[in-house]
Amino acid sequence: MVEEAGLPAIFCATGIPVDEEMRSRILRHQKERPPHFTTVETPYGFSPLEALELSEKAVLVDCVSFLVSNILLEEEDGEKAYRRTVEEFGVLFTRQEKEGFFLVLVSNEVGMGVVPDSRLGREFRDLLGRVNQWLAERSHRVYFVVAGIPWQLR
């Protein structure tokens, strides 16, 4: 979607290299990323975008799931993490309305699997589900991608 927009792209990276496996995963994603994408690290929110001009650009957030996880681990409370997450996206959406940039959010659907056996796992699953619903309600288009095949929900 971002490539098809034909605009200069800002890639909002939300992953944190907490261990060697994650470092390798991030490195692989960096190598796969098109060279004309400008990467901005946004693991806890979008304040790093404040200094950037975003009009006539595409902004890709990859991914919402890591951002939610990072905020949950910082806040240690699902309700506080929810409020903080929707506040971050609310600011981003307000800016998008003013500047008109093309925004793509990538998230995971984790509510379709087995219920996690840990409290934190269940809290994350529920929190991400609420955030995904909040984002979908405010999005013009919503896709569900399975096996690389996009299904447009809205």
What are these regions (language model features)?
Residues 1-54:
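Conserved P-loop
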Residues 29, 60, 108:
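Conserved RecA-like P-loop NTPase ATPase core
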Residues 7-8, 55-57, 99-102:
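Short coil/turn segments at beta-strand junctions that form active-site/ligand-binding loops
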Residues 15, 43, 64-65, 109-110, ...:
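Short, flexible active-site-adjacent loop segments at beta-strand->alpha-helix junctions, enriched
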Residues 32-84:
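Helix-adjacent hinge/juxtasegments
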Residues 9, 59, 141-143:
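Short, well-ordered beta-strand core segments
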